[in-house]
From Swiss-Prot:
CDD domains: UBCc_UFC1. Keywords: Ubl conjugation pathway. It comes from the Eukaryota. This is Ubiquitin-fold modifier-conjugating enzyme 1. E2-like enzyme which forms an intermediate with UFM1 via a thioester linkage. InterPro entries: UBQ-conjugating_enzyme/RWD (IPR016135), Ufc1 (IPR014806). GO terms for biological process: protein ufmylation. GO terms for molecular function: UFM1 conjugating enzyme activity. Belongs to the ubiquitin-conjugating enzyme family. UFC1 subfamily.
Amino acid sequence: MEGWDPNTKSTLTRIPLLTTKAGPRDGAAWTQRLKEEYKSLIAYTQMNKSNDNDWFRISASNPEGTRWTGKCWYVHNLLKYEFDLQFDIPITYPATAPELELPEIDGKTQKMYRGGKICLTVHFKPLWAKNCPRFGIAHALCLGLAPWLAAEIPILVDSGAIKHKDDAATSAES
């Protein structure tokens, strides 16, 4: 955590670490891991809300807990930019981090793979590997998606690659 800003350090240390090393193929152990994931996500969400930093909503979209969908948003120049968020839990989870997808901005930045999967290889994947199995979905959002949004969304907005929903509605009316 050396070289990290104090806010990120503080946030990360308050997200509960997970203990169960289990993936989708591991039956009852996976159910236990999912319980830990939910506890960690709830703690992270509550922490964000209490700090007036609420920026995502996700939930498992299938009973097995292997497909997750939701919304994330980023505020730039006092305008809220909202995006669909989705990801699948890999079979090799937790050894392999989930690939977070923002399909609406697929192809609009070089820091993204096909299908809207955000690039996390350089900074996040080594951190995930070092902290496996203690890191979970909440950690992927905190250390993967949040910094990616902070780095990429302002550039995409300023270059005109993405437009605010109000701007898009106004230009469609004209």
